[in-house]
């Protein structure tokens, strides 16, 4: 019986037959015990199909014993098949525009929310739907990319009188930036340390005001954040102020007030609009003179998704004045849809190997396909938008591979840094080091070089806290190899234990932003600044370098009126073989149309930005600064050259200079060398004429 009990039961059989004829009629087959038949039903003979082979007892024991042996691996036949995750699959999404109804069709929900908050009217959408789609794709992609910091451009600023400066700029950051920690207005980087970059004071009499005060919604959000940051800023009340520009990722969620407003932000709207008066309680710090959305941005090129340029993670951006990372808000006023909720939409298809090389699990981003590609098809009255694809999520194995590659990359970068930095102890070369600022990416000191008595700025960065160290190398090399009187001077660098020390020229005059927001410049002074910047640009372009982030934040001034270009964290090195770029880099309000529309571009993007900066010197702010960033991008793409307020008050030479800079057709736009010969520059006054403006800006902010 034991042998009978060990036999497996017979497999189930059909109780009815599908066969025709009289052989099988009505009945079925009963299954009994372990044998066949076991009692037939009617006249139907038992099913004669053979049972499965009975397993051999010896084989069963061998398998059991083998499974208990430690370290033994099951044979290929015994193990479950390893089914991999799908790769290179695509989820296509088509967005169209119905010209009859004036509505977009098939638009992702996140895009719809973004567009709803963009202040782009229905008429404007109907006028140029392709421009709307272009900026939506770009904007969405920017918010999802995990940007990396331009580490040597941190606006580390402590404030005199709890003042806040315009948050300068530039690149993306995965940690709270120094600009955020201290609200610096500095545009310079280590590349240029500035003194006295602070915001407008309530007693400033010669402020160049332009633009409008933003709505109540902006003010309420700003007030809330200011209340959060007040305790930290109060601690810095009496500290000395120096800025080193922070490169920032631009996340378009800045809570802002008009850059030209010289009033403090306080607890209510009336205080925002009227003069400030002493309060019994400590007054809240003033808002930044420029909104956070004046930060720079960096996205991947259309044709290149190499891991080296895939930015690092970043939390949603905060206002310029937000002191701590936990004070950040997940969504912005200007563009609430720029929050992480957009990360669920379809994105570019990433190659598996590139995906594995990332340092993080890629989140979906919008596909960046040119309008002329195969996915841009026009059907009927609809404008088709490029398809989008979803990259597969990274598996644990992928993440492990990512971490391994990241570690190897860090080792290579550190080895490269060792070949760049100087050997020795900087503490012996520099004395009287005084801490003047601290932020997420490092601490800034002023020091005296013992041998020369020259004052320098030293930034100390903990390399373990820098997620994209290769950008540090890029910036150091560009600065070291491109020395010019109009470029902030890189002096030296050292590796001290786990820290990188970078020594830069110290410019105490502050950034040009302080001057344009605090004072009124005449054409002679504007021409002088333009000439100096053009000399720097002509030098860089001749050496195949595009700056890509020209704006007043990145122009530093000496007390003698010297003008120097800084912030090379996002510069591009071009070559005859690769003379064009498509990476979205810069700050939206200063961006050239070809950058906004994702066309290939070259050095002339810097000349467009110079033209916008010239308008900034006239009006106190760039065009469209009071617009939602998404709408500003739309207006740049649609209108091209912006309108200039009171243009008739400008000289004909200045008007022509602006026309040459702001020519939409790149081939017709003047080069830096051409503009250096322009008659407008003959109006330039001596650089010493800038000194009174610098001192006036300092005086205006002194009481803040």
Curated annotation (Swiss-Prot):
Q: What is the effect of changing residue 459 to A?
A: Fails to rescue mutant phenotype, probably due to disruption of kinase activity
- Enzyme Commission code: 2.7.11.1
Mark out the compositionally biased spans (Basic residues).
61-73
Q: Where is this region: GTPase-binding?
A: 83-113
Positions of the UniProt region annotated as Linker: 97-429
Q: Which UniProt keywords apply?
A: ATP-binding, Cell junction, Cell projection, Cytoplasm, Developmental protein, Kinase, Nucleotide-binding, Serine/threonine-protein kinase, Transferase
Q: What is the effect of changing residue 569 to D?
A: In Pak3; pharate adult lethal with some adult escapers that are uncoordinated and have crumpled wings, probably due to disruption of kinase activity
Query: PROSITE patterns annotated for this entry?
Result: CRIB, PROTEIN_KINASE_ATP, PROTEIN_KINASE_DOM, PROTEIN_KINASE_ST
Q: Which SUPFAM superfamilies match?
A: Protein kinase-like (PK-like)
> Annotated region Disordered: where?
1-87, 159-188, 254-292
Q: Give the span(s) annotated as Autoregulatory region.
A: 80-171
Q: Where is the Protein kinase domain?
A: 430-681
Q: What class of enzyme is it?
A: transferase
Compositionally biased residues, Low complexity: 159-178, 255-266
Outcome of swapping residue 553 to N: In Pak5; pharate adult lethal with some adult escapers that are uncoordinated and have crumpled wings, probably due to disruption of kinase activity
Motif PXXP motif (SH3-binding) located where?
Answer: 9-12
Which SMART domains does the record associate with it?
A: PBD, S_TKc
Describe what happens without this gene: Homozygous knockout flies show defective wing morphology. Mutant embryos show guidance phenotypes in ventral oblique muscle 5 (VO5), ventral oblique muscle 6 (VO6) and ventral acute muscle 3 (VA3). The affected muscles bypass their normal ventral attachment sites and mistarget toward or crossing the ventral midline. Mutant embryos exhibit additional muscle phenotypes, such as increase in lateral transverse (LT) muscles and VA3 numbers and defective lateral oblique muscle 1 (LO1) and ventral oblique muscle 1 (VO1) shape.
Q: Name one Pfam family in it.
A: Pkinase
Question: Which residues take part in binding ATP?
Answer: 436-444, 459
GO molecular function terms listed in the Swiss-Prot or TrEMBL record: ATP binding; protein serine/threonine kinase activity; SH3 domain binding; small GTPase binding
One Gene Ontology term of the biological-process aspect is: regulation of MAPK cascade
User: What does the annotation say about its assembly with partners?
Assistant: Interacts with activated, GTP-bound Cdc42 and Rac1. Forms a complex with pix and Git; the interaction with Git may be mediated by pix. Interacts (via N-terminal PXXP motif) with dock/dreadlocks (via SH3 domain 2).
Per the record, the similarity remark reads: Belongs to the protein kinase superfamily. STE Ser/Thr protein kinase family. STE20 subfamily.
What is the name listed in the Swiss-Prot or TrEMBL entry for this protein? Serine/threonine-protein kinase Pak
Species assigned in the record: Drosophila melanogaster (Fruit fly)
Q: What is the lineage of its organism?
A: Eukaryota, Metazoa, Ecdysozoa, Arthropoda, Hexapoda
